[in-house]
């Protein structure tokens, strides 16, 4: 390893002629950990946004004609998640690209190892948050599709899953609704909900497509780095278990040592008594 002491220290003399050693603090890792904290906070924000998205999904699905305010709020949340996710991805990419420079530069292997580990952990945390978001979007799509199917049944039109998917992919709900006569209020309400749910799904699929590439890109990285993270976690757990085991063994050793010390003093005392008795017997024998 290269000696970094000359880089970190400098000498100067004060007015009295004494040598003063000035230690220059390495701000590189401080800046890195600050960036790590920013990324972690952004991921936590996405997790919070996803919970709000789920609540709005439930409200929209429970009402035949949900208020426009709720849908606007949902759309704003989706935009915020997308914007935050793109920022996180850009920061993680920048960190990843800096690894090559670090390897060819003057960074220590310890610093580089720390940076790689932090990057891997953040990437996996990010993918987990986006996977939860994707799961919420997929569930909302399926439940919205179920509502469309039920409303079509109300109008007297029975459809299969394949037929529903065909309608959604075409973007034209009129494929199934054009020949339905809205001769009653119930039928008109059903047709309105079919159209509304269809629009919701169209917006949803656009959002899913936009995030798919980013999600897959990060998921692939995490998959390749997953074994390294698992090894780190396994080593940490093993170290923790070893420390606990060492504590127990130390306690046993102390207890055993204490017992052994007591036995030693008992043996010494018994030996002294035996020597005294033998000396007494010899003394009496000689006296006779």
Swiss-Prot record:
The chain crosses the membrane at residues 265-288. Residues 35-101 form a coiled coil. Gene3D superfamilies: 1.20.5.110, 1.20.58.70. Keywords: Coiled coil, Membrane, Transmembrane, Transmembrane helix. It is a single-pass type IV membrane protein. The keyword Transmembrane applies. GO terms for biological process: acrosome reaction; animal organ morphogenesis; cellular response to oxidative stress; cornified envelope assembly; ectoderm development; exocytosis; intracellular protein transport; signal transduction. InterPro entries: SNARE, STX2_SNARE, Syntaxin, Syntaxin/epimorphin_CS, Syntaxin_N, T_SNARE_dom. One of its GO terms (cellular component) is basolateral plasma membrane. The keyword Ribosomal protein does not apply. It is found in: Membrane. Residues 191-253 form the t-SNARE coiled-coil homology domain. Interacts with SYT6 and SYT8; the interaction is Ca(2+)-dependent. Belongs to the syntaxin family. Essential for epithelial morphogenesis. May mediate Ca(2+)-regulation of exocytosis acrosomal reaction in sperm. This is Syntaxin-2. The gene is STX2.
């Amino acid at each position: 390893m290269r000696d970094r002491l000359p880089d970190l220290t400098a000498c100067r003399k004060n007015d009295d002629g004494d040598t003063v050693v000035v230690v220059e603090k390495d701000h590189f890792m401080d800046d890195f950990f600050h960036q790590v904290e920013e990324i972690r906070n952004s991921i936590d924000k996405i997790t919070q946004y996803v919970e709000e998205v789920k609540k709005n999904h439930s409200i929209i699905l429970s009402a035949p004609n949900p208020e426009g305010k709720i849908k606007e709020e949902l759309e704003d949340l989706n935009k915020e998640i997308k914007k935050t996710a793109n920022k996180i991805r850009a920061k993680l990419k920048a960190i990843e690209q800096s690894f090559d420079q670090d390897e060819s530069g003057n960074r220590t292997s310890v610093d580089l190892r720390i940076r790689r580990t932090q990057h891997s952990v953040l990437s996996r945390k990010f993918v987990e948050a986006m996977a939860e978001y994707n799961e919420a979007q997929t569930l909302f799509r399926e439940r919205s599709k179920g509502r469309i199917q039920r409303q079509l049944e109300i109008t007297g039109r029975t459809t299969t899953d394949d037929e529903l998917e065909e309608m959604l992919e075409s973007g034209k709900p009129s494929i199934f609704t054009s020949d339905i006569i809205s001769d009653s209020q119930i039928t008109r309400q059903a047709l309105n909900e079919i159209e509304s749910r269809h629009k919701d799904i169209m917006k949803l699929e656009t959002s899913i497509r936009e995030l798919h590439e980013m999600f897959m890109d990060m998921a692939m990285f995490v998959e390749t780095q997953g074994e390294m993270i698992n090894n780190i976690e396994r080593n940490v757990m093993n170290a923790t278990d070893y420390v606990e085991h060492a504590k127990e063994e130390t306690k046993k050793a102390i207890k055993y040592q204490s017992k052994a010390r007591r036995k030693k003093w008992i043996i010494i005392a018994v030996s002294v008594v035996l020597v005294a008795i033998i000396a007494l017997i010899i003394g009496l024998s000689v006296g006779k």
